[in-house]
From Swiss-Prot:
Name used for this protein in its record: o-succinylbenzoate synthase
Organism: Bacillus subtilis (strain 168)
Stored PANTHER family: O-SUCCINYLBENZOATE SYNTHASE, O-SUCCINYLBENZOATE SYNTHASE-RELATED
Enzymatic reactions: (1R,6R)-6-hydroxy-2-succinyl-cyclohexa-2,4-diene-1-carboxylate = 2-succinylbenzoate + H2O
Entry annotated with the keyword Lyase: yes
Keyword annotations of the record: Lyase, Magnesium, Menaquinone biosynthesis, Metal-binding
């Protein structure tokens, strides 16, 4: 039994080591809400709200998440008894959407649950691997800079490279990278920057043996993705289009993609992520675990999730040093010969370094059973 006695929200502001650009936004500063939940037996769990500051990825932002957590979700969870973390999303189901806010809260309860059971989060989720392959993302930049970055990551052992593309920086960019790295596992992420009328342009990418094209069309264009996939040899991977197991079911039934990116934050938490994983396993749909420029709290969670059997493609799970001069967890997330070890320690398997985190905390909100 888990009864949450106290929740603290830490508002963090951290600077990336260098700006990260995609087809929509350039990111330098990253804001987070870190969730610390303590149950009545004194066990602490950690979660992370990974929404961005502006609604370029989904409609959620750090600001909207804060509102939903303070005014609706946390009052609904504090003082309530849960037998299992999957009961948390059930308790919040009457509130529509706001999945990233829900995910941050639920993940803290998963951490508590695993710690009380004396098992790793990976084991609690049903993971079967002791290490997961590491992949990395390269943002849009001048070609020479991107080539140098890819070469550096290849030397570090990353098993898959994802590049961002957009109209005007696509076919020639991929061609140049393929010319330099003819055999490297390579995929392209469009972040919804194309329309169905661009089909001939996207078909040109078939010549470069990409693992996949991620989210070429708008998030709600699931039918258009079906039409596009029929004309492409390259597999389409859906990201923003998949926010629930029902979205995944529709995409599978329509044939809108061949691969699905599962991000716990995007789909509302680990419980929904497990449902999507199991559905994809049933339908032999490949999946991989995406990332969102997160701290080690979410990275540790993603490593645990990616240890499940249907995660057959290296995910966006890179070392802490990819984005941060220092992470807020110990040990930080590191790759070794192209893999990240799955922790066997109870819970997330990492500890929040309070001394480091305090450097980046701008505000705190505390919630208890008695207000």
């Amino acid at each position: 039994m888990i009864e949450i006695e106290k929740i603290t929200l830490y508002h963090l502001s951290m600077n990336l080591k260098k700006p990260f650009k995609n087809s929509i936004e350039t990111l330098q500063e990253r804001k987070f809400l870190i969730v610390e939940a303590i149950d009545t037996s004194g066990v602490t769990g950690w979660g992370e709200v990974s929404a961005f500051s502006s609604p370029w990825y989904t409609e959620e932002t750090i600001g909207t998440c804060l509102h939903m957590l303070k005014d609706f979700f946390i009052p609904n969870v504090v003082g309530r008894e849960f037998n299992h973390p999957s009961e948390v999303p059930d308790s919040l189901a009457r509130y529509k959407g706001n999945r990233m806010a829900k995910a941050g809260l639920e993940s803290a309860v998963w951490d508590i649950y695993a710690k009380k059971k004396g098992v790793s989060l990976a084991e609690a989720l049903g993971g079967t691997r002791d290490k997961v392959p590491a992949g990395v993302v390269v943002g849009l930049a001048p070609l020479d800079d991107m080539l140098k970055e890819i070469e550096s990551y290849q030397k570090e052992g990353y098993q898959r490279i994802k590049i961002k593309i957009q109209p005007g920086q696509d076919v020639e960019l991929v061609k140049a990278i393929r010319s330099r790295f003819p055999t490297i596992p390579l995929m392209a992420d469009a972040n919804s920057s194309y329309e169905l009328k661009d089909i001939s342009r996207l078909k040109e990418l078939d010549d470069y043996h990409l693992m996949m094209i991620e989210q070429p069309l708008q998030a709600d264009d699931i039918v258009d993705h079906r039409h596009l996939q029929k004309h492409l040899k390259t597999a389409i991977c859906l990201d923003e289009s998949i926010c629930s197991v029902d979205d995944a079911r529709r995409a599978i039934e329509l044939g809108s993609c061949k691969i699905i990116n599962i991000k716990p934050s995007r789909v509302g938490g680990l419980t929904e992520a497990l449902k999507i994983h199991d559905l994809c396993k049933e339908h032999h749909m490949q999946v991989w675990c995406g990332g969102m420029l997160e701290t080690g709290i979410s990275r540790a969670q993603n490593v645990a999730l990616a240890s499940l059997p249907q995660f057959t493609i290296p995910g966006d799970i890179s070392s802490s040093s990819r984005y941060w001069d220092e992470d807020i967890v110990t040990p930080d997330i590191r790759i070794d010969n192209g893999f990240i070890s799955v922790s066997k320690q109870p819970g997330l398997g990492v500890e929040v370094n309070q001394d480091i985190m305090r450097k980046y905390v701008t505000k705190m909100d505390v919630f208890t059973q008695h207000g």
